[in-house]
Amino acid sequence: MAGKVLGRSRYVCYNGSGDNGGDDINDDEDDKVSSCGVRTEPKLTTATLTEDVRDGAGDSESSSSGVSSRPTLANPVGPSYSSFQVDSFKLMELLGPEKVDPNDVKLIRDKLFGYSTFWVTKEEPFGDFGEGILFLGNLRGKRETVFEKLQRQLAEVVGNKYNLFMVEEPNSDGPDPRGGPRVSFGMLRKEVSEPGPTTLWQYVIALLLFLLTIGSSVELGIASQLNRLPPEVVKYFTDPNAVEPPDMQLFYPFVESALPLAYGVLGIQIFHEVGHFLAAIPRQVKLSIPFLIPNITLGTFGAITQFKSILPDRKAQVDISLAGPLAGGTLSFAMFFTGLLLSSNPDAAGDLVPVPSMLFQGSLLLGLISRSVLGYATMHAATVAVHPLVIAGWCGLTTTAFNMLPVGCLDGGRAVQGAFGKNALVGFGLTTYALLGLGVLGGPLSLPWGLYVLICQRTPEKPCLNDVTEVGTWRKALLGSAILFVILTLLPVWDELAEELGMGLITTF
């Protein structure tokens, strides 16, 4: 029968005994044709698969001794594997992002760069898949002035096809003689480097998450008002002999009393997102629709808001990232402090709800503020009666602190990346993961929050167009103050301090 030789285009004709018509195979046998009408080839079996197959030429080297004396290959299918590997690379290249046109690279190098701007000495791949070009060389002027000039000339030379990035030179030997880090210029196609628009299914998901967040916020309000359940309702759910369901009219006042807390939690988060958008508009940065994350303990874990355009510089990244937590945190603290004042007002006694005093041990900062306002007598008890605004503000401040953790693309991670660079974010991120894993920050919420970040928010932001220029001292100082607020808010009160301050009833065995 005829069989196809691996890696070859010719066919072999075998007889029934497995012979090839002779013991010796000569080089001229490659040109002979057997009686079955196809070219004869040396016999290949499992034991004697030793022919050195050569890709393309079609001719094999043979010795005068026999098939069994031929040199043995370590991998007889090597050429086929190499061909498959090359085809795989070609397929990945076709399916991958579109690369920069080599003709445009030559044109840009000749027209843009030179003695007065940036003297190019080397070119390297740029981007996640090497789809762009990175120009390395020597800067010939002030980096901001040169970058602005290159951006303007790029649009004049090739139109609106590419985005130009100014980044720190990778593996640089030292700083720039003019001061600061050495810079390079990367170029990517706009359709590759710019985020895509928000799709219809993303709007649907955002709507579903918003409805779920409303539900979790209402659930939080209901949980805070359980002591106000009508006796008939409590009896129905606790007495096994009660078979008659209570009148639904009894639930309406109970649910209405739970709504203010839900409104407060949702209002804080909406205020947070408005802060992001108000900071993004003057900087011409587009943001996606917020994807709210429901949580039954805090009402919400915040929201995922994506950048839908490339950030112009690191200052814009810091400003937009801090604007949301600053807005939401300010409103949260106003609610929290106002609620504490109302909690100590006898006229508001009818609106107060009891909460476990252990709650105030969950945050060092908020616990100390509560202790200073409410006093020893109120705090040194199993439960503390507080106004619902205290709970709303507490939840809002805790959510704000979690979102300001310096990791991934959280607000805190974006701000740290913009203020101190991507390398600093790696160090901050590892430290944050360690503290969350050990339960040092966040208490019982550290595990679910850490999983949420790992699944949804672990990836840092992509570079800004100008990813080199520093953000200034006051922005770094503001960010440092925000991180200090995060630590003090998420750090719990240790038992010795709580007992000394009279925060709750500490029981030791």
Positions of PLM-derived features:
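Hydrophobic transmembrane alpha-helices and their immediate loop junctions
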Residues: M1-F509
